[in-house]
């Protein structure tokens, strides 16, 4: 059996839709259930940020998770395939009508992705004070908590509604299929076959 960790929400639905197309049967979680067993697969429904943890500790053999989460957590997992779903961007944003003053001794940046932000600004040789937030990141520069934000956006609509603009795209992200290293060697044939089927389906869709 292969255990698959899925992030709650649209990515889980799109992934299960692909399983249905590949295997010709329904893969649907019962209401409020977090575990789904079907044939040779067991699916776990977890928070997006927790997918790498489940896979890393082999509670799941493979997982579906955003590249932004992988980069933020620097998880030691095998990246099998970019699924091309859940596309989004990690961006720097600041209030409309003003520019970020990079000449300041230190810029205040609000974000929940401190590792990605830290690495990006280190490459730019810029001194930043990273303020860790867990939600409503857009609020920070509007109330003087930060000069700018590093956040994840799909369309940028939420930023515009909060009078923020995108100053720079740090990285583009989409959902990846990843595997635990031990699981990969123990179940290599099955995992590679699943990767092949998903890759084939992706090519058809593109």
UniProtKB/Swiss-Prot annotation:
CDD domains from the UniProt entry: PBP2_HisGs
MF (Gene Ontology): ATP binding; ATP phosphoribosyltransferase activity
Source species taxonomy: Bacteria, Pseudomonadati, Campylobacterota, Epsilonproteobacteria, Campylobacterales
Entry's free-text remark on domains: Lacks the C-terminal regulatory region which is replaced by HisZ.
Chief subcellular location: cytoplasm
Its job: Catalyzes the condensation of ATP and 5-phosphoribose 1-diphosphate to form N'-(5'-phosphoribosyl)-ATP (PR-ATP). Has a crucial role in the pathway because the rate of histidine biosynthesis seems to be controlled primarily by regulation of HisG enzymatic activity.
NCBIfam families referenced in this protein's UniProt entry, alphabetically: hisG
Gene3D superfamilies: Periplasmic binding protein-like II
GO biological process: L-histidine biosynthetic process
UniProt cross-references to PANTHER family, sorted A to Z: ATP PHOSPHORIBOSYLTRANSFERASE, ATP PHOSPHORIBOSYLTRANSFERASE ATP-PRTASE
Keyword list, A-Z: Amino-acid biosynthesis, ATP-binding, Cytoplasm, Glycosyltransferase, Histidine biosynthesis, Nucleotide-binding, Transferase
Name of this chain's protein: ATP phosphoribosyltransferase
Family: Belongs to the ATP phosphoribosyltransferase family. Short subfamily.
Compartment(s): Cytoplasm
Organism of provenance: Wolinella succinogenes (strain ATCC 29543 / DSM 1740 / CCUG 13145 / JCM 31913 / LMG 7466 / NCTC 11488 / FDC 602W) (Vibrio succinogenes)
Signal sequence coordinates: none
The keyword Transmembrane is assigned to this record: no
Enzyme Commission code: 2.4.2.17
Pathway it works in: Amino-acid biosynthesis; L-histidine biosynthesis; L-histidine from 5-phospho-alpha-D-ribose 1-diphosphate: step 1/9
Subunit structure: Heteromultimer composed of HisG and HisZ subunits.
Superkingdom field: Bacteria
Disulfide pattern: none
